Amino acid sequence: MKAQARTVALAIAAGLFICVYRPLASAQKQPTPKELQNIATNAARHFGDAPDDPGPLATDLSYSIKPKAVAKAMRKVADWQLERSQPYFDRIWTWSVLYSGFMAASDSLGDPKYRDAMTAMGQKFDWKLRSHLPNADDQSVGQTYLELYLLKKDPAMIAPTKQELDAILAAPRGSRIPGKEIDWWWCDALFMAPPVWSRMYAATGGRKYLDYLDEEWAKTSDRLYDTTEHLYFRDSTYLTRTEANGKKMFWSRGNGWVMGGIVRTLQYLPKDDPARAKYIEQLKEMASSLAAIQSPDGLWRAGLLDPGDYDMPEISGSALITFALAAGVNGGWLDQKVYRPVIEKAWAGMLHHVYADGRLGSIQQTGAEPQPFKASSSYTYGVGAFLLAGSEIRKMHR
């Protein structure tokens, strides 16, 4: 055992440790019948599943965050997802997050096939958003349309999205439904919509898109951001909800959505935007809070302040957090000396959940709060977050 420990330590030090880790049997609560039905529904819609036998875990990936090693892991996961998913592409948010990951992967890896798949997707849907507007989820696919437009300058790629955003600006704001009086009433919305609006500004120069973005983000932040914990509640119904240990309920994926939304918005926000400093300050506050509660395995549990009640790490939230931290370092908004070790540990932790065929597991199914899930569970949005994280980690070496 001592010799084996020395071998592992030397391999880690060399940045060449190969993923032969196998998770121990978990005592985590199993999904309820209702949650299992949700898993089945997700599988029927082709954006994820949780098989009883997903096969062996990968043994050919390095924990190193050097560009070549990260690229290998990204390709393995991206190729598995693209092959099984492309025939079923849709415009719902569960897919659009994957599309953002594919766009980032093409840029990072220098491989046009993922971007080409996105162009084909846009053509399939005539570059239109889903119809349930102003719902932020249904705006999210516009991020990919706009990124393709900024590369190819084809006005047809953004004309329907621009028409829809302009209609939102012209309509009365908010809803009369209690808790939903603002457009972005749940924290996930801050990943889904704001990057669309900042990209529309980049595409058109229209200041009105940034004005709406800044105004609506401020409303959501005022309602859902806890200025003590520096974390976001999922929505106003969770303001008084607590975990089993009595602490406030903060969902890892929800907070990952917010952090990811901040950096994806900042990347297209002009330097003189009056709210820019507020976004950066909130990113710094959240990064500090999340780094302090990173688990020993490098990841975050579904319930951030009650990790003892969630044995298994949750990959979609962890990947979004890792993406935001790496993007924050690359943007000069976060201190590399402080956050690089956090990022390295998180990336290594995520690789423990890559299977031999490329499946990325330990992703919580769709929902609104921490829930039990299976080790094999893999969903498109978690893969998208993983690819975003890998792309930013590779930039750290440029």
What would you call each of these model-derived segments?
Residues 76, 80, 101-104, 124, ...:
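Alpha-helical scaffold segments in carbohydrate-active enzymes
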Residues 9-20:
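Bacterial N-terminal signal peptides
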Residues 259-305:
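Oxyanion-binding "anion nests"
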Residues 31-96, 105-124, 128-144, 148-167, ...:
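CBM-like carbohydrate-recognition segments
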Residues 112-119, 127-239, 244-250, 357:
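Extended ligand-binding groove/face enriched in aromatic
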